[in-house]
Structures are given as structure tokens and as C-alpha cells.
A protein has these predicted regions:
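Membrane-proximal first intracellular loop
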Residues: 1-113, 117, 260
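Hydrophobic cores of alpha-helical transmembrane segments in multi-pass inner/ER membrane proteins
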Residues: 5-9, 70-82, 162-171, 232-242
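Seventh transmembrane helix
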Residues: 11, 224-271
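Interhelical loop segments of eukaryotic multi-pass membrane proteins
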Residues: 26-29, 51-58, 91-97, 129-146, ...
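Helix-to-loop junction signature of class
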Residues: 37-52, 117-138, 203-226
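Membrane-water interface of transmembrane alpha-helices
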Residues: 78-88, 169-183
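Extracellular-loop-to-transmembrane junctions of the mid-late helices
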Residues: 116-177
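Intracellular effector-coupling site of seven-transmembrane GPCRs
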Residues: 173-216, 232, 236-239
Length: 275
């Protein structure tokens, strides 16, 4: 399931980059890229055929054990960046203002998840190298992880939960603005599909928050939580890969549709949200 979701996200991302009629902002690209990286990190043993049988390559197992404890934080961080950018876009459309700190703050939101992830990865990797006896393949043989009284999982889950909690706060604010200013947003040129996708995205974010809290209190959450976590890339690919402009880009045999002219305010203030 995770491989399918990762493959679909890769197709979506490549299409968005190469298709001239598909425009996406940097936070959207960052979100899809992070999801793909996460899928690769969890499936390293699958790619080299070492999920079953003898113990996997020690070096690969050490690297993967550090990755699987770091990438959930990256996912939570890019999730926050995307919803924060959505908030600035909706706010711009409602209050007719430019997006908050258009350059510096936006770059900080996009770069911060990867900086934090690299720091965590290096920390976990150093620990795994110094304590190789704590690294083992999980019970289902899917990936290698660090087993040390549940501490690495709780560190990852705790940081992810904080980031997701902030995301949920932003999502509630965005949902409230959408409800209160529905007509204004429709007249501003913001597509209705954008509203639907924000609500779906918010539901997924809330689900991730609950799952990270499960990881904190139960040291892993069990196979049920693992299954839902593995399904998130597939959910993301369905949410972000079924937008009209992407589908039209894949239907290359159809003539291009004439571009609709957006209102001036919509072009200046609300371009580049989730669409």
C-alpha cells in the first residue's frame, strides 16, 4: 500500500513539475517530496530483498533505523508548512492583504522540516552506530528500527504530535474562515474543489495527530496504527493527485481548454494554495 501511494505521488509530482498548465507552490511540492522520501525510507529492505531470511545488511539496517524515526517528523513538518501556506492564501483572499512574510517566513516553513529531520536522523544514526544491539528488524520484517525502551519512538511521536497540533489549530482557523466567508471566497476566484480538499486534508491531519499520540502512550501503536500510517501516502495521492488540471495533463490527446481569466484580486493574493 505504501509503495502504491509513493508511486502515485511520484507520478503526480513529476506531472506537476513538467506540465506547463499545472502550477503548484513550493509547499505543495515539498509535501509530495517528503511523502515519497518517507515511502522509500520504510521500504529500503524491500528494495534490496532483505525483508525475510537472514539478518539484513548491518549498514543498511542502521541507516534505515535512523530514517524511520526521523521521517515522521518531516511529514508532520511539511504538513504544517502546507496548511500554514493555505492559511496565508485564504487570509489574503478574505482580507485583501498580501500573504504574511511572503518570502522569509515561507522559506522558513519549507526549510525547517528538513533541517529538523536531518538533525534527528544524524542523532539517531550516531546512537544506532554506538549501540548496534538496539537495532533490529521489526516483527513483520518490514523495516529496521531502534529498540531502546521505546525512547526513539516517543521522541519522534512527541515532536510530530506538537507539529500536528499546530497544524490542526491552523486547520480549524482555515475552516472557520471558509465557513464565514464562503461567498466572498467563491467570488474571489478560489475554486470550490479547493475547499473540499482542505477539509479532507484537515481530516487526514487530525488522524495523524491521533496516531502520533497513540505511539507516545503505547510505544508503537500496534499493527492497526502501522496499517493506517502506511495508507497515508495513498490517501495523499488521492487527495492531491485527482485535481482537474493534473487529470487534463494526463489526457494529452484532448485539446487544451481555454484559460479562464481570474479576478485581479484572486490573481494577486490567493494564487498557489492547494490547487
Amino acid at each position: 500500500m505504501q509503495l502504491v501511494g509513493g508511486a502515485l505521488l511520484l507520478i503526480t509530482l513529476v506531472t506537476a513539475i513538467l506540465a506547463k498548465d499545472v502550477k503548484r507552490n513550493l509547499s505543495w511540492i515539498s509535501f509530495c517530496s517528503a511523502s515519497i522520501i518517507s515511502c522509500v525510507a520504510y521500504d529500503l529492505l524491500f528494495f534490496v530483498g532483505q525483508q525475510t531470511g537472514p539478518s539484513p545488511d548491518r549498514g543498511l539496517c542502521l541507516v534505515q533505523s535512523a530514517l524511520v524515526h526521523a521521517v515522521p517528523v518531516m511529514q508532520a513538518g511539511v504538513n504544517l508548512a502546507l496548511i500554514a501556506h493555505t492559511w496565508t492564501s485564504v487570509r489574503a483572499a478574505v482580507y485583501q492583504k498580501n500573504r504574511v512574510s511572503r518570502c522569509n517566513l515561507f522559506i522558513l516553513f519549507v526549510a525547517f522540516p528538513y533541517i529538523l529531520t536531518i538533525a534527528l536522523f544524524l542523532g539517531f544514526l550516531v546512537f544506532a552506530i554506538q549501540h548496534p544491539q538496539t537495532v533490529e528488524r521489526d516483527n513483520m520484517g518490514v523495516y529496521c528500527k531502534i529498540v531502546f525502551d521505546g525512547v526513539p519512538s516517543k521522541i519522534t511521536a512527541g515532536i510530530s504530535a506538537v507539529l500536528m497540533l499546530v497544524s490542526v489549530i491552523f486547520e480549524v482557523i482555515v475552516a472557520r474562515m471558509l465557513i464565514r466567508h464562503w461567498k466572498l471566497l467563491c467570488h474571489s476566484g478560489m475554486p470550490r474543489s479547493f475547499v473540499i480538499r482542505v477539509l479532507v486534508f484537515s481530516a487526514v491531519g487530525g488522524l495523524v495527530l491521533v496516531l502520533t499520540m497513540v505511539y507516545v502512550v503505547s510505544d508503537g501503536g500496534g499493527t492497526g496504527a502501522d496499517f493506517i500510517m502506511a495508507s497515508l501516502p495513498l490517501i495523499s495521492s488521492l487527495v492531491f493527485g485527482t485535481q482537474e488540471d493534473l487529470i487534463r495533463a494526463w489526457m494529452f490527446w484532448r485539446p487544451p481548454r481555454p484559460m479562464a481569466v481570474k479576478p485581479i484580486r484572486a490573481r494577486n493574493d490567493s494564487e498557489g494554495t492547494l490547487e
